[in-house]
UniProtKB/Swiss-Prot annotation:
Gene3D superfamilies: IlvD/EDD C-terminal domain-like. GO terms for biological process: isoleucine biosynthetic process; L-valine biosynthetic process. This is Dihydroxy-acid dehydratase. [2Fe-2S] cluster binds at C122, C195. The gene is ilvD.
């Protein structure tokens, strides 16, 4: 029978000092012996997805204490990728994931906490907390802040839906008037919550639900809706049950590594491919799998991508649907239900409620459930009122979207495409693979061959695109923006958005060893591995070379002979210590970022730290 970790600090005369300090936090004699459960919050006024979380930690803590636990809350950092985008701030986004994971480990282990409730929401916060949860392997439940409502405005006498990406594209489009750009900017992000499309934040929160570490509805129920409050209340109660199951009943099925096992990881990736999620999720799932000591690699993702169809299409891949529409169609479990009927899921998995996948679908799949309360929850919709307050409205759709032939979520028979929304490409240009979000690629450019224009920074590429130096048919390559080379593996949302602004969204390709925002669409290929700073072929290409992309056949080739590539590699290595560094880039890199770069692996490993360098 495992002993409560917290007993280390609460029992025995030699811990009198620790108990004295616990008492100073409000604990009393009756609390010593109860499980100490930490509420890992991520409130900040910098991030719309987190601006409403201040009071939600207290809500969870009250339920923990009412259920027989002791609650202790702390906060992690949270970077807003959209605000950090397009300048030096983006260098810090991905490294913040490791800091978040480490900070959770530090706080939990330093104070011997027994379990956690993780209140996350946005891009690097959810994966950072996931990595920590699987590293620590103590009972955990995730409850996120929820998605933002989609923006709406009237343009050309038509009401259209908007999101952050629309503001970026219109702001850079020379054909758009200042008045229209301003109107879109003011309408794009109307409420608190994670940006309203299937961008990285919402993709990750959906995957957490598929992994079994959060409750049904967590990935799609709007941040503003009153129904979301119940998820927080339930999390506080349920974590005490999970904690006692493990520590008092020796039930290891309550631990995250036994819930989010390899079968669950495969299900989560299957969901990601079917819903056309952000390419960043690949990076984060690979990193989380390493923390869980699960053998889950790019090869597994490649195999899944070849058999899973696209059953859901959401912004930025279409303007018709946003997360509020996914929820109306049944949310994550609506998609999982269709995947299950197609025989594409591992059924022998459980979630934090203790339900198997078939049991969960029976209760929560809107196409089969008889539970009217569940149907009501999935009718929770937007209010269209600007607010930063959680649970501030209780509007509902008049009906559910259960049309699996022409609705937001489709059945296998009526899939958007036979191929899924993500694909892994291999070739002499990316020997260890690269990722493309096929859900956002127009059918006309699934095969694309063109001349290369090489840039050694995102800034240079943006200047060239906006300056008219990139033309139809070009393959834009941005290198030395990987985990080491950036450092920090910047997102390339501005270059892809500006290609659209210049009318080149369906006429050019963009390839990088950096990564893309979940808001990216178009022929955008990222995570090229090995990266330039690690000696990848991407470091050897020159202006005017030709790259051939063949998504249906999962291929990306630099059209040069092996002899020419070898000769260029020899010339590159002759540069000595500067061999795998950009030639003409001036960039201020802080000591903190240099420390990150010194241990970072390429994207095919999840951009995690290289344990071999630390003797691990």
């Amino acid at each position: 029978m495992p002993k409560y970790r917290s007993a280390t600090t609460t029992h025995g005369r030699n811990m009198a000092g620790a108990r004295a300090l616990w008492r100073a936090t409000g604990m009393t004699d009756s609390d010593f012996g109860k499980p100490i459960i930490t509420v890992v919050n991520s409130f900040t006024q910098f991030v719309p997805g987190h601006v409403h979380l201040r009071d939600l930690g207290k809500l969870v803590a009250e339920q923990i204490e009412a259920s027989g636990g002791v609650a202790k809350e702390f906060n992690t950092i949270a970077v807003d990728d959209g605000i950090a985008m397009g300048h030096g701030g983006m260098l810090y986004s991905l490294p913040s994931r490791e800091l978040i994971a480490d900070s959770v480990e530090y706080m939990v282990n330093a104070h011997c906490a027994d379990a956690m409730v993780c209140i996350s929401n946005c891009d690097k916060i959810t994966p950072g907390m996931l990595m920590a949860s699987l590293r620590l392997n103590i009972p955990v439940i995730f409850v996120s802040g929820g998605p933002m409502e989609a923006g709406k405005t009237k343009l050309s006498d038509q009401i259209i839906k908007l999101d952050l990406v629309d503001a970026m594209i219109q702001g850079a489009d020379p054909k758009v008037s200042d008045d229209q750009s301003n109107q879109v900017e003011r309408s794009a992000c109307p409420t608190c919550g994670s940006c309203s499309g299937m961008f990285t934040a919402n993709s990750m929160n959906c995957l957490i639900e598929a992994l079994g570490l959060s409750q049904p509805g967590n990935g799609s129920l709007l941040a503003t809706h009153a129904d979301r409050k119940q998820l927080f209340l339930n999390a506080g109660k349920r974590i005490v049950e999970l904690t006692k199951r493990y520590y008092e009943q020796d039930d290891e099925s309550a631990l995250p590594r036994n819930i989010a096992n390899k079968a669950a990881f495969e299900n989560a990736m299957t969901l990601d491919i079917a819903m056309g999620g952000s390419t960043n999720t690949v990076l984060h799932l690979l990193a989380a799998a390493q923390e869980a000591e699960i053998d889950f690699t790019m090869s597994d993702i490649d195999k899944l991508s070849r058999k899973v169809p696209q059953l859901c299409k959401v912004a930025p891949s279409t303007q018709k649907y946003h997360m509020e529409d996914v929820h109306r169609a049944g949310g994550v479990l609506g998609i999982l239900g269709e995947l299950d009927r197609a025989g594409l899921l591992n059924r022998n998995v459980k979630n934090v409620l203790g339900l198997t996948l078939p049991q969960t679908l029976e209760q929560y799949d809107i196409t089969v459930t008889q539970d009217e309360a569940v149907k009501k929850m999935f009718r929770a919709g937007p209010a269209g009122i600007r607010t930063t307050q959680a649970f501030s409205q209780d509007c509902r759709w008049d009906s559910l979207d259960d049309d699996r032939a022409a609705g937001c979520i489709r059945s296998l028979e009526y899939a958007y495409s036979k191929d899924g929304g993500l694909a892994v490409l291999y070739g002499n240009f990316a020997e260890n693979g690269c990722i493309v979000k096929t859900a956002g690629v127009d059918d006309s450019i699934l095969k694309f061959t063109g001349p290369v224009k090489v840039y050694e920074s995102q800034d240079d590429a943006v200047e060239a695109i906006l300056g008219g130096k990139v033309v139809e048919g070009d393959v834009v390559v941005i290198r030395y923006e990987g985990p080491k080379g950036g450092p920090g593996m910047q997102e390339m949302l501005y270059p892809t958005s500006f290609l659209k602004s210049m009318g080149l969204g369906k006429a050019c390709a963009l390839i990088t060893d950096g990564r893309f925002s979940g808001g990216t669409s178009g022929l955008s290929i990222g995570h090229v591995s090995p990266e330039a700073a690690s000696g990848g072929t991407i470091a050897l290409i020159e202006d005017g070379d030709t790259i051939a992309i063949d998504i249906p056949n999962r291929s990306i080739q630099l059209q040069l002979s092996e002899a020419e590539i070898a000769a260029r590699r020899e010339a590159q290595e002759a540069r000595g210590d500067k061999a795998w560094t950009p030639k003409n880039r001036q960039r201020q890199v802080s000591f903190a970022l240099r420390a990150y770069a010194s241990l970072a692996t390429s994207a095919d490993k999840g951009a995690v730290r290289d344990k071999s360098k630390l003797g691990g």
